[in-house]
């Protein structure tokens, strides 16, 4: 009896291993081929396993996807969804925007990561239907083939360099005011190609170009993580790679989870948030970053207490050094890429009309009150409330808002403590005069 049980267990393990191996080998291909030596009894199970994982990740839609750079990690089980949420392939429910997971480089040590989609599953389905409908094709058309035939993509195929005219009409705030310097940075640091480093796209395959164009059209968040990495001091989580329509980045907890934090932690997070906005407004590269809107899910906190931008999809960038070419949204520039996940009628105002105060006003209106109200002794709380009132007014001038947030930052600095709860600056803060 025991030997029969062991034999059954060994057979099950062998079948599971073969399925995994086939998935790994087939990862970077968008077609399916079956090894001749695979036992016939395993064919349906392996085919079903492969199809399920491929469809969940969006690999069946490549190259209308984000990338394939981290697919091997998924199929070697070096990225695992947290708590093994589903059987066999460990696939979680499909209706979530992001997923907690664990990542390993050696299958021994693991660290938390976040796996996220650029838009919701519902929006992805709407987008795919729009692509098919654009040529009156059935709902199950080849979206990659349709996108490859568009006039915009044909221009991309011929282009040696990514220029502002190639991104005209795309809806992302990131491309609202593109400069050549910014677009060169995109190409030079694009992590989904093998030989990054050049401003020219000679080393890009047709698939590489379609993936980059698709990502820019749907959500530029992964591109921003790549070109402004946290390793260089930018307030962004680390981009680890993409597979299909999912990207993997270092894990953070969203800001809303800290609304009930202690006064010391609330003051520290609010101070960090203002410092982040300051670095986006004024930095060595002379880029002016601004938010078109904010919510608490756009900012996250690492385990060490450090605050970062968790979602960069609402970030616009203006090149103060080179100047920016306003992104015109005329009928001439609009195409299917303009309307994949947004209203085709969105109007973009002039780059010159974005005020310096914009991000500060949004944060003072929507985030800082949730962190700071009712947390401190009366005299201090009154000062904080007064500063918030000033910096949250839409009709205030840039100077008035900047002055109010500078005052608020000074108040918050005095409320920060130096202890192990704030590992990102401890024990260094013990030797800093400001503490």
Swiss-Prot record:
<protein>
    <recommendedName>
        <fullName>Divergent protein kinase domain 2B</fullName>
    </recommendedName>
</protein>
<keyword id="KW-0732">Signal</keyword>
<comment type="similarity">
    <text>Belongs to the DIPK family.</text>
</comment>
<dbReference type="InterPro" id="IPR022049">
    <property type="entry name" value="FAM69_kinase_dom"/>
</dbReference>
<dbReference type="InterPro" id="IPR020519">
    <property type="entry name" value="DIPK2A/B"/>
</dbReference>
<feature type="glycosylation site" description="N-linked (GlcNAc...) asparagine">
    <location>
        <position position="102"/>
    </location>
</feature>
<keyword id="KW-0964">Secreted</keyword>
<keyword id="KW-0325">Glycoprotein</keyword>
<feature type="signal peptide">
    <location>
        <begin position="1"/>
        <end position="33"/>
    </location>
</feature>
<dbReference type="Pfam" id="PF12260">
    <property type="entry name" value="PIP49_C"/>
</dbReference>
<dbReference type="GO" id="GO:0005576">
    <property type="term" value="C:extracellular region"/>
</dbReference>
<feature type="glycosylation site" description="N-linked (GlcNAc...) asparagine">
    <location>
        <position position="395"/>
    </location>
</feature>
């Amino acid at each position: 009896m025991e030997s029969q049980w062991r034999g059954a267990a060994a057979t099950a393990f062998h079948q599971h291993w073969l399925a995994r191996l086939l998935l790994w080998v087939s990862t970077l291909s968008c077609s399916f081929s079956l090894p001749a030596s695979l036992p016939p009894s395993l064919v349906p199970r392996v085919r079903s396993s492969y199809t399920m994982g491929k469809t969940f990740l969006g690999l069946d839609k490549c190259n209308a996807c984000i990338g394939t750079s981290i697919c091997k990690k998924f199929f070697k089980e070096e990225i695992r969804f947290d708590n093994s949420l589903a059987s066999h392939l460990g696939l979680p429910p499909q209706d979530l925007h992001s997923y907690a997971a664990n990542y390993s480089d050696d299958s021994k040590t693991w660290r938390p990561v976040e796996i996220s989609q650029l838009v919701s599953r519902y929006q992805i389905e709407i987008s795919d239907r729009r692509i098919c409908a654009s040529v009156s094709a059935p709902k199950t058309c080849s979206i990659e083939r349709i996108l490859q035939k568009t006039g915009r993509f044909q221009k991309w195929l011929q282009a040696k360099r990514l220029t502002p005219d190639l991104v005209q009409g795309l809806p992302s705030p990131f491309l609202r005011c593109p400069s050549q310097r910014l677009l060169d940075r995109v190409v030079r640091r694009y992590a989904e190609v093998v030989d990054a480093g050049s401003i020219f796209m000679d080393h890009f395959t047709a698939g590489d170009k379609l993936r980059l164009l698709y990502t820019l059209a749907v959500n530029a968040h992964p591109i921003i993580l790549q070109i402004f990495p946290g390793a260089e001091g930018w307030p962004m989580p680390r981009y680890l790679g993409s597979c299909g329509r999912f990207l993997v980045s270092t894990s953070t907890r969203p800001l809303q989870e800290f609304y009930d934090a202690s006064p010391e932690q609330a003051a520290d997070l609010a101070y960090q948030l203002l410092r982040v906005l300051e670095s986006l407004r004024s930095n060595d590269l002379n880029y002016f970053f601004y938010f078109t809107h904010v919510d608490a899910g756009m900012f996250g906190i690492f385990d060490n207490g450090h605050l970062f931008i968790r979602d960069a999809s609402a970030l616009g960038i203006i090149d103060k050094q080179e100047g920016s070419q306003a992104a015109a949204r005329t009928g001439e520039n609009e195409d299917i890429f303009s309307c994949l996940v947004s209203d085709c009628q969105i109007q973009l105002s002039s780059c010159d009309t974005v005020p310096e105060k914009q991000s500060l006003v949004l944060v003072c209106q929507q985030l800082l009150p949730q962190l700071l109200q009712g947390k401190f002794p009366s005299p201090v709380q009154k000062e904080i409330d007064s500063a918030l009132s000033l910096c949250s007014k839409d009709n205030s001038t840039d100077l008035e808002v900047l002055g109010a947030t500078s005052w608020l930052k000074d108040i918050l600095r005095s409320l920060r403590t130096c202890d192990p709860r704030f590992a990102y600056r401890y024990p260094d803060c013990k030797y800093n005069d400001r503490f």
